Every structure is written in structure tokens, then in C-alpha cells.
Amino acid sequence: MNDLSTSKGNSGDVTIQIVNILNRLGLLVTQPTAFDGTVENAVRAFQQSRGLTVNGVVNSATLQALEEARWKLGDRSLYLQSSQLMRGDDVATLQARLTDMGFNCGRVDGVFGDRTENAVREFQQSVGVKVDGKCGPATITALIRLTRTVSGGAPSILRESAMHKSRGPALANKVIVLDPNCGGGDRGIFAHGVEESEVVYDVVQRLEGRLLALGVSVFLTRGTNNSPNESERIIFSNKTNADLIVSFHVDQYINEKAHGVATYFYGSQAHGIHSVVGERFASLVQREICARTDLLNCRTHAKTWDLLRLTKAPTVRIDLGYLTNEGDAQRLGRADFRDVIAESIVIAIQRLYLASEDDAKTGTLRIDDLRKAGIRR
């Protein structure tokens, strides 16, 4: 898979591959030889259904999602590879079925990793087929024959909620990863005299100081002089055994009138799954920022971006505003405004861990209130 984008007007082997997959998925009924308007519309529909950025352009993320979507359970044997892990809708279906029967695969993410292999082994042992951790014909047949044995809500959601509640309301000793976009030579979006790399790093530093004062162990995915790629950020975050991961970005658009703040959590319409903790935290962040600032509420959205999907802890991405909008850029360029954003996020983090009966009205809780309640130092 290459990193080059394929879009309207292109042709060639990659375009043919895209058309073939879209046909198999039922999103195209014709077989165009070039990337025309019908292909672009089909790509947009696919991106929408998969929680990807909807632009009709097939970049590396969309091409990877198309490749994963073409696999159905039974098309191939599934097993743990020592190099590149197997990914696909067939893996997600396997994980979902095992989870429904009470076997812990972790998050249903469509990636065949260690936890999925262990769950397959446990399932194989329970049904009396060869225990090798590989999902071949015999294991698939056993899966198809068995019905659900767990009820009362999706088990993965129940596990995530239970683990979250078990951590208690105090922020002390929790581990939070802060992920400022860009860094090093990558300065990100630049408009109206404001630079993405500087804005997000400044917000992260302000948030880091507040969290450290609350007893939180804080990890940053980058400093000022480096710019890790997405895979490196995911690997780093997973090694910290974090309770929560927060990624900071700004946005841009061709129409300078686009403005406002938005948050994103992991959720897949195609697989009917989402991170319940991620969704709640994204909602809390959105509400706190909008209650304390005049940024437009661009709402909370489920996405399947790898940073949200492949991180072990609940992960939320915050797009702090549009630098291509003069008003948003002016706001984000002010230190006092960035300070309010940092305050909003730390309060949202605390509200995430408070029981509903102890929670406060959006926009009213202050750090001093946490001290008085005995849940900060």
C-alpha cells in the first residue's frame, strides 16, 4: 500500500483495485476504468460508513480500510503473524463473535493480535477442536454453529465500563497521555499568523501542569524537536498503560467560514461498536469547552482513525478550531484563551471519573472545587 492519494481523474492499477472492491461491497454497479464521478461518490459513501474523513479521495487510510472491508469470515485462515498483523472485517467479525460468547479479545478493532489469539485458543479448548490459536475451517464452523451465550449488553462495553469505574474518582495515580499533533520540522497548518504545532503544544503544556498538580502521571508523545508518525504515537501510548489518551489538532477548510471545535472517539458503524468511555469523555470535553468559550459547537463524532482504534486506552481527538477561519485563529493565538481550553479539558477529565451523583453542571466546576471535595491534592 502506498502513501499516494488517488482521486477523480486518476487511472491505473490502484484505481482498478479500488473499483473492484467497491463493486464487491455493492457500492458500485458499473466497472469504470478511470476514477470518475461515480467512483468518487462510492468512495464518499464508503468513507461515511467506515468513520473516515469524507472527501472522495483514496489516501493510505481509505485504501487500508478498503483492503480490510473485502475480507469476510471464512475467506482465509486467521492467525497471529510475526511481522505485519492480519487486519480485516473477517478479524472484526471473529472478535465480535468471540466477545459475544464471553471470550475476551479486548477491543473489536479488526486486528489479529495477541489477545485475539488467546481468545481463539480458549474458544477452541472449550469446543473441543485443535488448540492452535488459528481460526481455520474447523474453528469457523464451530463459531457459526454456536449462538450467543452472553446477554445484557455488549460484553466489551461492559468490560470497558467496569474497568473505568474500578479506577475510582481521584485523578491521583492515573496515567494520561497527551498527544500534540505535528512537531519538529512539521509545523502543521499555518494561517492568519497562527501555527498548529505551537498552538497544540502550548495547550498540552498548560494541561500537563494542571494534571501534574492533581497527581496524574502525564506522558507526552513528542517534544518540540521531534514529530513521530501515527504508528510511533500509538506504540508509545500503548507502552504507558494509560488510563486515557487525548490528541490535539486544529482544522482547516477551503471555505474560511468553517469554524468551531469538534471531538472524536472510536466508533464503527460497520461493526456496530464504539468506545463507551471515549464517547463520554469526548462529549464532556465538547460541552466544557463550548460552555466556557464562544467556539462553535461542531459536536462529537465516531471515527475509525488508527489513533482511536489501535490504542488500548480510551482515546479522544480534539480539533480545537479552524485556523483558516480568522476568528478561530485569533482566539487560539491568545494565551488566555488557550488557558481556558486547558482548564476546560482538565475539568472534563475529572468529570469523566466522577459518579453521576457527584457530577456538577457543565461549565461550573473549578479546580478549587476538586480540592474542597478531597479528590485533588
Q: Where do the language-model regions lie?
A:
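Catalytic-site microenvironment of enzymes
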Residues: M1-L25, G37-G51, S60-A61, E68-R377
